[in-house]
Swiss-Prot record:
Residues 1-65 are annotated as: Domain I. Homotetramer. Forms an RuvA(8)-RuvB(12)-Holliday junction (HJ) complex. HJ DNA is sandwiched between 2 RuvA tetramers; dsDNA enters through RuvA and exits via RuvB. An RuvB hexamer assembles on each DNA strand where it exits the tetramer. Each RuvB hexamer is contacted by two RuvA subunits (via domain III) on 2 adjacent RuvB subunits; this complex drives branch migration. In the full resolvosome a probable DNA-RuvA(4)-RuvB(12)-RuvC(2) complex forms which resolves the HJ. The gene is ruvA. Disulfide bonds: none annotated. It comes from Bdellovibrio bacteriovorus (strain ATCC 15356 / DSM 50701 / NCIMB 9529 / HD100). Residues 145-196 are annotated as: Domain III. GO terms for molecular function: ATP binding; four-way junction DNA binding; four-way junction helicase activity. The RuvA-RuvB-RuvC complex processes Holliday junction (HJ) DNA during genetic recombination and DNA repair, while the RuvA-RuvB complex plays an important role in the rescue of blocked DNA replication forks via replication fork reversal (RFR). RuvA specifically binds to HJ cruciform DNA, conferring on it an open structure. The RuvB hexamer acts as an ATP-dependent pump, pulling dsDNA into and through the RuvAB complex. HJ branch migration allows RuvC to scan DNA until it finds its consensus sequence, where it cleaves and resolves the cruciform DNA. Pfam families: HHH_5, RuvA_C, RuvA_N. This is Holliday junction branch migration complex subunit RuvA. InterPro entries: DNA_helicase_Holl-junc_RuvA_I, Hlx-hairpin-Hlx_DNA-bd_motif, NA-bd_OB-fold, RuvA, RuvA_2-like, RuvA_C. GO terms for cellular component: cytoplasm; Holliday junction helicase complex; Holliday junction resolvase complex. Has three domains with a flexible linker between the domains II and III and assumes an 'L' shape. Domain III is highly mobile and contacts RuvB. Keywords: Cytoplasm, DNA damage, DNA recombination, DNA repair, DNA-binding.
Length: 196
């Protein structure tokens, strides 16, 4: 799993960017906000936070200019009916702090004004995430009371293709001090048959 890439921005396209890391070009999909930030830094060395999305027929890299956007993206993936492409579209509609504020305020009207978000999706986002995100401060948007191990286990199981709801239920049942390897191993045993 790739956590971040450090390299030079070679090209910025409509919905993706090309980053040269030690002679290898990685294409990352990103929100229009991140792409705008990267365009301004074209030719410079940068760090881009990465979410690796694995499907049966593809491996895609989603990039974020900061951790706040990445964490909000991962939270949006927990919403039923929101996949990576829709989550990027939502993030293209505003900065993480603005979207977070809409969710916490229960403002379905404002959320439904974001790209590709209808009334039902906006309501589902609020139902799933309201009260489960802490305020955006120096550390960004993070899930409440989640240990580092739980976060890593969740990320690993989602990257392996397990369904978000099953992963969340499973991880919430684990002790906070569990070793990451043990959690992933138990996840394989418990969630077999739960691939998307």
């Amino acid at each position: 799993m790739i956590g971040y890439l450090r390299g030079k921005i070679i090209e910025v396209m409509n919905d993706s960017a090309l980053i040269d890391v030690s002679g290898v070009g990685y294409e990352i999909h990103a929100s229009s906000n991140t792409l705008g930030d990267l365009q301004a830094l074209l030719g410079n060395d940068i760090i881009v936070w990465i979410h690796t999305h694995v499907r049966e027929d593809a491996l895609q890299l989603f990039g974020f200019h900061d951790k706040e956007e990445k964490n909000l993206f991962l939270s949006l993936l927990k919403v039923n009916g929101v996949g990576p492409k829709m989550a990027l579209s939502i993030l293209s509609g505003g900065r993480p702090a603005q979207i977070h504020e809409m969710i916490e305020a229960g403002n379905a009207k404002a959320l439904s004004g974001l790209p590709k978000v209808g009334k039902k999706t906006a309501e589902q986002i609020i139902l799933t995430l309201k009260g489960k995100l802490v305020s955006i401060e120096e550390g960004g948007v993070v899930a409440k009371a989640k240990s580092v191990a739980h976060t890593q286990i969740t990320s690993a199981l989602l990257n392996l293709g397990y369904k978000s709801q099953l992963v969340d239920q499973f991880v919430s049942s684990l002790p906070a001090d569990i070793a990451v390897e043990d959690g992933i191993r138990k996840g394989f045993q418990t969630l077999s048959g739960g691939l998307s």
